[in-house]
Amino acid sequence: MGLKLLESRLCLLLLLGLVLTLVSCQRPTPSQKFDIQHIYKKSSPKCDDAMRVVNKYTGKCKDLNTFLHTTFADVVRVCHNPPKTCKDGTSPNCHDSSSKVSVTICKLTKRARNYTHCRYKTTGAKKSYTVACNPRTPKDRPTYPVVPVHLDRLF
């Protein structure tokens, strides 16, 4: 009896560990990825530090990345501006911001095998931007029905 109880507890523990592993390994939704890659609420980041977070999801050094110094909620509001065709010439779900925001552009200067050792040049600017927006996925927070999924361009 004691052995069976121990075995069942061990199986339960293993099952719980497997479930937790699967949950923690889930990929972010497109809007969560957008938030990770492009929203930086603080003032200008050091690109070497900020890009470690971005690169963690692919395990590789991203060549170029732009951080918008604004909130996710502010970018969601841009999704309600009039739609236009995206830079690819086919997607009709892009929207221009109404005002300029501070941005930080990170350009790869030294690639490394380990993404945590990549080096970037940091450039700051004030730019307007265009984002592509889609309906939220079931895994997104229900707060916003439409969410940004791609930073299309700066202007």
From Swiss-Prot:
MF (Gene Ontology) = lyase activity; nucleic acid binding; ribonuclease A activity
Where in the chain are disulfide-linked cysteines found?
Answer: 47-106, 61-118, 79-133, 86-94
Query: What CDD domains would the database entry show?
Result: RNase_A_canonical (cd06265)
Enzyme Commission number(s) from the entry? 4.6.1.18
User: Where do the catalytic residues lie?
Assistant: 38 (proton acceptor), 150 (proton donor)
SUPFAM superfamilies, A to Z: RNase A-like
Record's keyword annotation contains Lyase: yes
- Please list the reactions this protein catalyses: an [RNA] containing cytidine + H2O = an [RNA]-3'-cytidine-3'-phosphate + a 5'-hydroxy-ribonucleotide-3'-[RNA]; an [RNA] containing uridine + H2O = an [RNA]-3'-uridine-3'-phosphate + a 5'-hydroxy-ribonucleotide-3'-[RNA]
The task this protein performs is described as: This is a non-secretory ribonuclease. It is a pyrimidine specific nuclease with a slight preference for U. Cytotoxin and helminthotoxin. Possesses a wide variety of biological activities.
Q: What is this protein called?
A: Ribonuclease 2B
> What is the scientific name of the source organism?
Mus musculus
